[in-house]
Amino acid sequence: MMKTDVVIIGAGAVGCAIARELSKYQIQVMVVDKNEDVGGDASKSNSAIIHTGYDASPGTLESQLVVAANPMYPELVKELDVPFKQIGAILPAITQEQFEQLPAIKAKAFLNRVYDIEYLTKEQIIAMEPNINPEVKGGLHIP
């Protein structure tokens, strides 16, 4: 009978990352999942953006973990020899109300130590994403 020290339930991105990290130690790790292969369900349906934590509640465990994890990705993808391009995201403001919320969103990002968010004009957003709603007022570029 095989001895298992740790059982990880779920073979998505998080479960596999935990298993990979634990494999560095002298313990037996087992990953179980309801699917036949890894990376199913939520992990295969994400937006392919590495979340920066710009909108997490400041001071929470989530914000601390996301901000701490971000610098780890370049080394991780190098070790795994997988393609990686951090292109960021556009947070468009279509309504005036959304546009007026942009400074508060940027301030929240700053509290989470996400400093390189940039304001985008309507023209910049349309140049970056020509198929966006033409009513866009402006937005933020989030790395």
Which residues are covered by each model-predicted region?
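N-terminal Rossmann-like FAD-binding beta1-loop-alpha1 element of flavoenzymes
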Residues: T4-V31
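Active-site substrate-recognition segment that forms the wall
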Residues: A17-K24, K34, I50, L80-K85
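Short, flexible turn/loop "capping" segments at secondary-structure junctions
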Residues: S43-K44, V82-K85, I132-E135
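Acidic/polar active-site rim loop that often engages polyanionic ligands
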Residues: A107, V136-K137
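Dinucleotide-binding Rossmann-like beta1-alpha1 core, especially the glycine-rich loop
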Residues: A48-M128
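Helical element adjacent to the flavin cofactor pocket in flavoenzyme catalytic cores
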Residues: L140-P143
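Glycine-rich FAD pyrophosphate-binding loop
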Residues: S23-S45
